Structure formats: structure tokens, C-alpha cells
Amino acid sequence: MSSKTLDQQSAVVIFSGGQDSTTCLVQAIAQYGLEQVHAVSFRYGQRHEIELRCSLNICQKLGIKYHRMIILEELSGLTENALMNQEIKISQSQEADYPNTFVPGRNALFILYTAIYAYQMNITNIIIGVSQADYSGYPDCREGFIRSINTSINLAMDQAFTIQTPL
């Protein structure tokens, strides 16, 4: 590992403003303290813009000092799905047995960008509100994926990040 020392007593939460990530944010505040918790949100062309507005409001109400909004609008030009295109009716599954709201690589991008932010802010702990038990067919919510990307970002940045999925 590199000589850069990351703070193990702080965390950054991948924060959509939805129910799961809000639960993670509140849990992180309880565990690490308000001053030690950062939030990162993503605008990627998603249908539920209200969640992003909620993320801003929730961070403000909770007193989160460090809330970063990362823009990934280009993602909507790379993939078509019901989560990003309001003209597509949401359905439970398609040919590949994934719901048509599946955005390929979304959580991988979120985790990578958040790890870059965490590295710059000297933060070890990355929290994301995915749950294998409730993954709705999304392969990037599975425990194996989370373990794999944790290893990959640690190797890519020569650090010892810990990705937490407390739900």
C-alpha cells in the first residue's frame, strides 16, 4: 500500500436521496459523527430527479457539510432503459432476466467516482445502500460484485478502502 494514510474514522456515502441511501447516511452519522460524513450524489439522466432534490434537502437538514453532486449525463447516451427514458414503460424483466430499469455499470461507476473522491479527501470507508437480498435482479448489487470492485479499486489506487453495504 502507498504511504498516503486514509482516515478510518470518516465515511463517504453514495447518496441518491432515496430510502436506502438515506438510511445509510443516518447510520453513517450515528457511527462516524456528523463532521466525519460526506455524501456523493450522481445525476446521470435518471427518471427520478426528485430523489436528487431530496438529496440536497436531506443533506441540508441533517447538516452534512460535504455533499458533492457528480454529473454523468453521458451515461444516457450509452444505454437505453426505463430508469433513464420516460418513454419506456417500467416492467419487471426482459430477455436477460433483468428488470428494464437495469443500468449496466451504474454502481461500478458510482463506486469508482466515489473512491476517487474518498482518496482525495483521505477517507477509507465508502458506503452504498445496495442489498443482495433486495437486488431486484441487478447484478451490481450482489455481494460478489461489491467484494470484487472493492479489491479492484484498492489495487487501482494502492489503498485499503472498505466498501460497506449495511442494508
Where are these regions (language model features)?
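ATP-dependent adenylation/nucleotidyltransferase module used to activate substrates
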Residues: 2-167
